[in-house]
Amino acid sequence: LGGGPGTYLVEFLRRWPGLHGAIYDLPATLRVARRILNERAPWAVARSDFREVDYTAGELPGPVDAIFMSNIIHSEDEAANRGLMRKCFRALAPHGILVIKDHIMNAGLTEPAAGAVFSLYLLLTTRGRDYSFEEVSGWLREAGFSDIRLEPLPSPPFTSSMVLARKF
């Protein structure tokens, strides 16, 4: 969801040869993704769907086995993120998994430091900010998810973490 130029999609497809992937994003982004993937990874295009989806409007396509969101929740306010978690839950097949990659902050919203500084920028440019694991896991529980866990990514190079949640 919000697959951008397809960077993560290509790596997922490379890692799992039997996987069929999809990018759900806005029309302009899909045009860029298709151009880049046709040039650099045409094999990935054959194993992927490209669908125009505005996650802020309407339901998400489904059922799907997994949803990967990278750097989306920090652009939205709490109410929009709660709604997005509910949409993801409805789009997932039973036993599906949601993976959220973003700056996931500590309870005091002070670490990681890069996320705290980025939140200042977000407050000026979006409706969002970086959220704590407690906040994100609360939205996920409200939406019906379980087995919610935080998986930090190696730092450096990453300043992000992943939150994983299951639909049972």
Language-model features: locations:
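Alpha-helical subdomain
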Residues: L1-F168
